[in-house]
């Protein structure tokens, strides 16, 4: 979000954007790949699902989700980085029912009760709280009744209680928005916006969580 939220580290460009997937694999010692695959399996995607991928990036996650969809399914990715969008189009070229749109996710979106599932992976923490709430409201509006919202991101924890070998890189790599994000009760926040039926799955020693909620 450099142009919109200078303190954020969610939006990347240049060398980092061009080699994003490789860098993430290196930083996590290959762990991210197994986490995202596990998370997508836990989504229990149906062949005809319509999925909205917020902050879709290179399309890596979208391509994994597309493998669970039939020709009658659909995936729409949203991103604002031209470099990421270019990679998405290249990576997902074999899936005609997957598309990427250049659109901010923290502003009103045109979708209303259209999607069965919405997925957001390591993006929500990079916004200030009011923008996060707008994103959640966009998700609620975009989902069909009983539609599912999946947030793969940091769990709630205290930086002070992290082991030193994790605390130092976390504080170096992340931004102030992330430090705020991990202190929030996201189940409570989502419930206040109309979501319920929560389900949680943890990764990386409980520092990462897949939080599922349902529009009721």
Stretches with model-predicted labels:
Residues 1-44, 60, 167:
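Conserved class I S-adenosyl-L-methionine
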Residues 110-118:
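A short acidic, Gly/Pro-enriched loop at the edge of an enzyme's catalytic core
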Residues 4-7, 151-193, 197-204:
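C-terminal alpha-helical "lid/dimerization" subdomain adjacent to the S-adenosyl-L-methionine
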Residues 70, 128, 143-145:
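Helix-to-beta-strand junctions that scaffold the AdoMet/dcAdoMet cofactor pocket
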Residues 50, 74, 146-148:
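Short glycine-centered segments of the SAM/dcSAM-binding site in methyltransferase folds
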Residues 133-145:
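A short glycine-rich, Lys/Arg-flanked "PGG" loop and its adjoining helix->strand segment in the class I
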């Amino acid at each position: 979000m450099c142009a919109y939220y200078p303190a954020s580290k969610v939006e990347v460009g240049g060398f980092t954007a061009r080699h994003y997937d490789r860098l993430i694999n290196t930083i996590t010692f290959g762990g991210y790949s197994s986490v995202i695959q596990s998370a997508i399996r836990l989504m229990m995607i149906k062949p005809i699902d319509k999925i909205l991928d917020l902050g879709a990036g290179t399309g890596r996650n979208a391509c994994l989700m597309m493998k669970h969809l039939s020709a009658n399914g659909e995936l729409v990715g949203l991103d604002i980085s031209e470099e990421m969008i270019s990679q998405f189009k290249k990576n997902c070229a074999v899936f005609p029912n997957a598309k990427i749109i250049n659109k901010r996710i923290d502003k009103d979106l045109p979708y209303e009760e259209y999607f069965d599932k919405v997925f957001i992976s390591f993006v929500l923490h990079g916004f200030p709280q009011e923008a996060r709430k707008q994103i959640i409201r966009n998700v609620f509006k975009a989902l069909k009744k009983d539609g599912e919202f999946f947030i793969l991101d940091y769990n709630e924890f205290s930086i002070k209680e992290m082991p030193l070998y994790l605390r130092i890189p976390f504080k170096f790599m992340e931004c102030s928005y992330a430090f705020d994000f991990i202190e929030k009760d996201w189940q409570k926040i989502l419930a206040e916006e109309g979501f319920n039926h929560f389900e949680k799955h943890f990764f990386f020693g409980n520092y990462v969580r897949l939080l599922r909620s349902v529009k009721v």
